[in-house]
Amino acid sequence: MEKQTRKKRIVIRNKPVPEAFKGKVYLDPTYDPAFKALFDNEEALKDFLNGVLELEGDEMIKELRFRFEKPIEFRVPQRKKVIFDIFATTGSGRFLNIEMQRLEHDYFIDRTILYKAFLVIKGRKEMEESAEFKALPKKEREKRRYQLPETISVWICDFDLPEAKDEYWDEWALYSRHAIRNGIAVPLSKKNKYIFLSVPNFTKSADEVNGSAEMWLYLLNHARDGGELPDFGNEIVEEALDRIRVENADDKLLEAQEHDMTTKEDYECWAAGKELAAEARGEANAISVFEKLGASPEMIAQAKAMLAAEDSNTFK
């Protein structure tokens, strides 16, 4: 699976490549800017989702619309907003959100449920506003008052999966306890699904990779290693990798990648959880935990700044 020579893109830069990326072939796609660049193509996202959803033949996604950093806001009764990394809809009326999560925090599971609730409401709202739904007879619309569209949340995690340690793939759905006791582990509804993928726990070699989902997991895990990745014979994957090649990245992408770690909210949740745990063990604060874990000086400095901030206005 040797990499074939590909035509080099012409990139005009006004600044030198940052030191952090010198000697590396790709940008790390577990960080937000490179993650967006990797999937900034309908065919790439369809290939990934078809693999993750295990769709084949006529079931494969044929039409896909998507948007990065989609804000979803409702009043319940106070205003509440979440921002999806990727919000996507298929031609068949399926609604999806795809999240890249680098850090685990104490309320991660709660967060996945909250995001799913917003996705369900957003999907229902768009479904009832569609031309197809409005064209239905009044009685049919009334019958479907509580009908929900299929919604799928995909969480790509750079850590162990909740309730599935050491595994790289897990799925959640709504089950009947009675049915499970009787050996029938079938979801009550196929419309409500969570898929969790652990990037570091995907340890298959390039030769062991099978199917598009595993190809994407392999590159998500190994693009950050620094070297050239093998050619899997998938042109869509190769084009996606070209978008995160250091030599192809413009100043804007390189600058964003250099400064991006995770969202402010992730750091606040994670740092607060670590600090509380540290205090319970008699540690001075979360900084000592960072240092013992071997965190980089940059991460320690950023954590110190965040913990020292008196209010959210400190973060710009």
Regions found by a protein language model. Name each.
Residues W172, I180-P200, V209-A223:
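Low-complexity, glycine/alanine/valine/leucine- and proline-rich hydrophobic stretches
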